[in-house]
Amino acid sequence: MLTGVMNELSAARTDAQAPAWRHLPALQQPAYPDEAALADVVADLRRRPPLVFAGEVDSLRNLIAQASTGDAFVLMGGDCAESFTHNTADNIRLKVQTILQMAAVLTYGASTPVVKIGRMAGQYAKPRSSDTETRGEVTLPAFRGDSVNGHEFTPEARIPDPTRMLDAYLRSGTTLNLIRAFTMGGYADLREVHSWNRGFTANPAYKRFESFAEELDRAMRFMEAAGVDFEALRQVDFYAAHEALLLEYEDAMIREDSRSGRLYDTSAHMLWVGERTREADGAHVAILAGVHNPVGVKVGPTTSSDDLSRLMDRLNPEGLPGRLSLITRMGAERIREALPPLVEAVRADGRPVTWIADPMHGNTITSDNGYKTRRFETILDEIRGFFEVHRTLGTAPGGIHVELTGDDVTEVLGGGEHIDEAGLAEHYETLVDPRLNHQQSLEVAFEIAEMLKG
């Protein structure tokens, strides 16, 4: 992550830049009971400093452009929904460590740079399939993330509270500061990251990765013998991204770059719109169309080629490399059938995109004992399908987007630890969707590294 200059960005916007999204359909927005309180919070956010800087955002866009041609690989990972309660230094450190470990393995497998993006420092809002939640005979507003309302199933907690956006802003800033400290202060030392991975492969459950780890060992010894300056490898660039869901918050964080006059959403380096909010004529696409950040769109199995054409027209009409990523979430059973016509249509269009696989959201199931979960092997199967499609068509598999944690939770079935349905109850902690735990995340990285080598 680069060091930004604070005075690059100003809160001022001209009348010509007034948000057009307010006149468009805005799905998945909370109904705040106190509009005056909402207006006060938005005004407060507009006066606050940016969380990220234009130079950092531009650097990320250039890296994502490299991934679109196979000259880099994007790794996006983090919580389904961040929690105010779990926004601790230890939890942040463990997530960063997990992503750094995955990146080291992927870098060796791909023989290209890995672009590290945390689904962190802002992932506090979540879309929901229903506006309400019913338990027994009680129905309350759905939990929409800590930046909107509380998770507790009480009438008071579930009332949307705009002051939570201020809390989200402050916690996002704290997270970014810690990420900068960890990744720029020696914590990301390649030798240290490699030693963590050796600890992983020493586990008999992951013995099949031992030969890969030995290759990495030889590469490290060669680098040392060749006089590589490991001190120069103690720092890495690490970026932050989240879903642009809560429109009042995102709009309040838009700033103008004094160098270029361009607008940036300074709540994150990269933002994406989800499957539920990706309408080309909707408010979420409109707000991202007006900023210069790299953006992503979640693409499910019902997406048509015409849908993608309209989204490219709205979000990247000029065809700028690195501007638009298409994050596919097809489901393992459908990706080999649904993805090829979309890839072919985009290639025929000619405007560059970066293809990123989300193997999580299309593979969610409910276990027999009532837990929302995913199967590890199904997640891997969707990743394999993603690579197979791109290899067959001669296009670049640009990256992976996974929900993960650095903790030893038990939320995803299977993997080397053989988590079964009975084991889900041991450490099931997610607020919304199930995440890969630390060991499962590394297992995914080793599997993808083998695919990248092949």
Predicted features, each with a name:
Residues L2-N149:
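Long, contiguous, compositionally biased segments that the model treats as domain-scale units
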Residues S59-R61, D281-H284, L311, P340-L342:
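Glycine-rich, charged/polar anion/phosphate-binding loops
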